[in-house]
Amino acid sequence: MDESSLPTPFRIALEHLREKTQAEARVDAVCNNFAYVWVSDLRKANAEAPPGGWIRLPTAFPFGNPHGLVTTEPLKREDGSRVTDAHHPNHDMCKPVQSLGGANYYSWTWQDCPPIRDPRDIVGVLQWYERRIRRG
């Protein structure tokens, strides 16, 4: 995907994410003003889980909040049971990355979270998703 067409603040956020934690982060799709950002090192609660996932970021980031996560396999807790909170298998939100294996949508929103004010807040977004996965 040609990232040069994305808004400057979004590109700054993506570059910061690559520099700080996710060197392989990339945008695999854009649909309805949301970019599907692949993060290969997304830490999951269960060590046997396949790595990575797509964070749905508005192309207006940081002026719009993240909304959802797409994974190839259902997320599991440390005990091996499935994370069912806001889990939607084969949801329409998976379609932009379905050909890459996206099959499980978690409709986690940024409600009641710290305000995002800067493109560099992207690292905190990733950490928030990892905490949410651990909590199940």
PLM segments and residue spans:
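UBC/E2-like fold recognition across ubiquitin and ubiquitin-like conjugation systems
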Residues: 1-50, 60-136
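Solvent-exposed residues in well-ordered beta-strands and their adjoining turns
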Residues: 56-58
